[in-house]
A protein has these predicted regions:
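Structured alpha-helical segments in the cores of large, soluble enzyme domains
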Residues: 95-102, 119-133
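Residues forming the flavin
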Residues: 2-78, 82, 124-129, 134-465
Length: 465
């Protein structure tokens, strides 16, 4: 027999969690369906080095907290990047929303974690000048760095805060969304039918492909997003201290001379660690930094954004194909010295060992990224290093390590109203999996928007943010 709830939320990432937080005091019956583990089981599995490797890898991208649960916990407190919510509201509204999201993270344990970017105005101006001289755009941001360990504690506190009328079902992937006569009915998950008045789809990056197919089957208009493909860079932390000491997170954007492609840095982790990420069986790379554990290196991604034109409309499949080549050649991520890339030769374990940069992910296979990345992408990345070296001397060192590949998959973007509602009444789509956000802060903010919209519809509006 079908079970009924007022609200069903698909996905327990930041978008889904913040929707539930906004609704928690309304008395509505709420069901959160999550394909991965609940937070305590998830943390335990992440620490269990004896657990099957496949289970540990899958645990990285799904479960309570979403793909960001084991990230380095960066809250990007800016409207300049991190998503496209400014397409649905003005920047002033978005800034207030992000500030509110930050206050919620602080309330659950983030208070006291350092905010970068409020000081060093003169030094930031000088960095912008140097970047411009190198054909780079330097985009600083205010960042609250929670750290991977503190981020896990915050997610646990959030999980524990929900009253009894909020039900969480972990290990329960949603199979289908139910719509009848143009109205949302509920979902089928784990062989059970769950009916609802309001449906919030927050499937996350790991559920992006599934959600795109569901949206298309329901006749919802979608548009393909770009795919970002590149490498994770690792260098001695001292090289990037002139940037990271004054601005923990920033973006450097470059348009390549050869192809006019947009190339950018992403997710800089001072004194951090390179890690593997499991995307439905495909092993890619990412980076973390911790509040209480440090390495001697800084890592970040260099990504090339590619927006495909008609007739091609499967950027996710293209990105998966590139990642599969690295897996085929290296059995997982490949690592190569920048100097070996320039010299047209593969890296060997011996050359990596003799290098000046000691890898924080020793499990990566020394290899040849030119056999994986298309020429266009590799050329763009090499040009980016030449430009970076003018801002951070040493960036273009032959000892710099490149791990590949790093791929950022973005769901096809669903056509939404300013309330983040699909054309099907009371069916909302939010977060990275809906193609409208790209980070913790804006994904969380999207959840607040929908939570408050549902509050308004049931006659319990919340105050202005």
């Amino acid at each position: 027999m079908a079970k009924s709830y007022d609200v069903v939320i698909i996905g327990a990432g930041p978008a889904g969690i913040f929707t539930a937080l906004e609704l928690a005091d309304t008395g509505l019956s709420i069901l959160i369906l999550e394909k991965g583990l609940d937070i305590r089981e998830r943390i335990a599995l992440n620490r269990d080095r004896t657990a099957p490797a496949a289970d540990r890898r899958a645990n990285i991208v799904s479960g309570w907290g979403g793909a960001g649960a084991f990230s380095d916990g960066k809250l990007t407190l800016t409207t300049d990047y991190g998503g496209n919510l400014d397409d649905y509201m003005n920047k002033g509204e978005l800034a207030r929303l992000i500030s509110y999201v930050d206050s919620v993270y602080c309330r659950f344990g983030g208070e006291g974690r350092q905010v970068y970017g409020d000081e060093h105005r003169d030094k930031i101006h000088e960095l912008k000048r140097k970047a411009a001289a190198a054909d780079l755009a330097f985009i600083p941001a205010r960042i609250r760095h929670l750290g991977t360990d503190v981020n896990g504690e915050i997610l646990t506190h959030m999980r524990d805060s929900f009253p009894s009328h909020v039900t969480v079902k972990a290990n329960c992937p949603v199979d289908h969304i139910l719509v009848k006569d143009g109205k949302v009915e509920g979902v089928i998950a784990g062989g059970e039918t769950y009916l609802c008045k309001y449906l919030v789809a927050a499937p996350g990056r790991d559920g992006a492909e599934w959600f795109t197919k569901e949206a298309e089957s329901l006749g919802l208009h979608t548009a393909s997003n770009a795919v970002d493909i590149g490498v994770r860079v690792e260098s001695p932390a001292e090289i990037y201290e002139p940037i990271t000491d004054i601005c923990y997170e920033s973006k450097l954007v470059y348009f390549s001379k050869s192809f006019d492609d947009r190339v950018r840095t992403f997710c800089m982790n001072p004194y951090g660690f390179v890690v593997t990420e499991n995307n439905n069986g495909l092993m890619t790379v990412n980076g973390h930094s911790y509040a209480h554990k440090k390495s001697g290196n800084t890592n970040f991604a260099i990504l090339v954004s590619k927006q495909f034109t008609q007739p091609f409309h499967e950027p996710i499949e293209y990105g998966k194909y590139i990642a599969s080549l690295a897996n085929m050649l290296g059995g997982g991520p490949i690592v190569q010295r920048l100097g070996d890339v320039r010299d047209g030769r593969r890296s060997t374990a011996e050359r990596i060992r003799r290098g000046l940069v000691h890898p924080t992910m020793p499990s990566a296979t020394p290899g040849d990224l030119s056999l994986v990345l298309p020429y266009r992408f590799l050329k763009d990345i090499m040009e980016m290093f030449e430009a970076l070296d003018k801002v951070a001397p040493g960036a273009n060192s032959r000892h710099t390590l490149l791990y590949g590949v790093e791929v950022k998959f973005y769901s096809s973007r669903i056509e939404l109203s300013n309330q983040l509602e699909t054309k099907i009444p009371n069916f909302f789509a939010i977060g990275d999996g809906a193609g409208i956000t790209r980070g913790l802060a804006q994904a969380s903010a999207a959840g607040v928007v929908v939570g408050r919209e549902i509050c308004a519809r049931i006659g319990k509006p919340k105050g202005e943010i």
